[in-house]
Structures are given as C-alpha cells and as structure tokens.
Design a protein with these regions (language model features):
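Structural beta-sheet core signal
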Residues: 1, 77-78, 140-142
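Active-site HxH/HxHxD metal-binding segment of metal-dependent hydrolases
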Residues: 1-29
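Fold-independent oxyanion-binding glycine-rich loops
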Residues: 4-5, 80-82, 104
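Hydrophobic pocket-lining residues within nucleotide cofactor-binding pockets
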Residues: 6, 58, 145
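Divalent metal-coordination and catalytic microenvironments
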Residues: 11, 53, 67, 81, ...
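A short helix-to-beta-strand connector/capping loop
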Residues: 28-36, 49, 136, 162-165
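Core dinuclear metal-dependent hydrolase active-site scaffold
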Residues: 32, 36-89, 173-177
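Cap/insert and terminal regions of metallo-dependent hydrolase folds
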Residues: 84-173
C-alpha cells in the first residue's frame, strides 16, 4: 500500500493495530509480511506495475493528495479531496490532460461548507477548470458528490455552460480514454 506518511501512520495506529485488524505488516512473518506500507511524498514520481505516476498536491483539511498517470493519450488526473488548489493548477500547467477526475462535493447553496471543508462546489469547480486552461475536448468527470447532492450538483454544473464536457462518474461503469 502506497500513501502519504500521515495516512500510513493512521493505518498502523487505527487499523493494523491487533485491535481492529491484525498487523499484516508483520504477518505471517516480520521478514515476509502480507502487506507493506510504502510512503511517498507530493511531487514523487513512481513507476508501479509499468505505469508512470506522479503524486499531486491537494488542498484539504487532512493530509491528502491526487495522482496523475501517464498514458499514451496524455495524463489521467485524479485530484483526490481538494478545494481550490493553485499548486495543483501549476503542477498540471502545460501537460496534455487525457481526462480529469475532480471532486465536487457540495452544491452551490453549500459553498460556505465546501470552502470550510476544502472541497469544491459547481461554481468553484468552474473557476478551477477555467484556470487550468484545458483543451475543451478534455473529458471532465466529477466524483465525491455527497449523498443526496447529485441532482443539484449536476444541474448547477450544466447551468454554468462550461466550454468542456463535465459528467458524473457512475458506480460500476468502466471508462476508457
């Protein structure tokens, strides 16, 4: 399992602690565990399973990150939980983005909550997308919409008349790019 050091520490303390679950980082033997926790930092570039990825900055209330994976058609980007994020925009500037998966947790009536919790609402999403200067043909998928918010969030995004196609990810659906 690869993750930020803070996330891996939380897994050690709260999950793999022999209270909730056994410590699989030491089982069946300390020298041959089932599970290895491997830290990474924002900005790290890794090759995992033949796929080149980069760990991206996120702006959230707890340690978080995004991921970009290089593909033959460009970069597939997942923002993770994030609010407005100048560091992410700078990191992505000039890259050919094949697809962007970006969180949009709350509707615009709950924008204040989105700001406090460092998430996005539709109008905040629009600001981020326009500042990214993406090719209008880049597919934009929203994710992390809070329960009961999907109709309001997608309706508000549609009303923004953005120059790119924005759609909500659907559970169980497979996407190719």
């Amino acid at each position: 399992v690869h993750g930020l050091p803070e996330t891996l520490d939380a897994l050690r303390r709260h999950i793999f602690n022999n209270v909730i679950w056994p410590d699989f980082t030491r089982l069946p033997h300390a020298d041959r565990p089932i599970l290895e926790l491997v830290p990474f930092q924002v900005g790290d570039r890794l090759t995992l399973g033949g796929l080149r990825i980069e760990i991206l900055p996120a702006w959230h209330t707890v340690p978080a990150c995004g991921v970009a994976a290089e593909t033959p058609s460009g970069w597939w980007v997942f923002t993770g939980d994030t609010g407005p994020n100048p560091a992410l925009r700078e990191c992505l500037r000039g890259r050919p983005i094949a697809q962007l998966v970006i969180e949009t947790a709350f509707n615009d009536e709950e924008r204040a909550l989105a700001e406090i919790s460092r998430h996005l609402s539709p109008s905040m999403l629009a600001q981020e997308l326009l500042q990214l200067d993406l090719d209008p043909n880049t597919p934009i998928a929203i994710t992390h919409v809070k329960p009961g918010e999907m109709a309001a969030v997608t309706g508000q995004i549609a009303a923004l008349d953005l120059p790119m196609t924005v759609f909500a990810l659907t559970r169980g659906e497979r996407y190719r790019f």
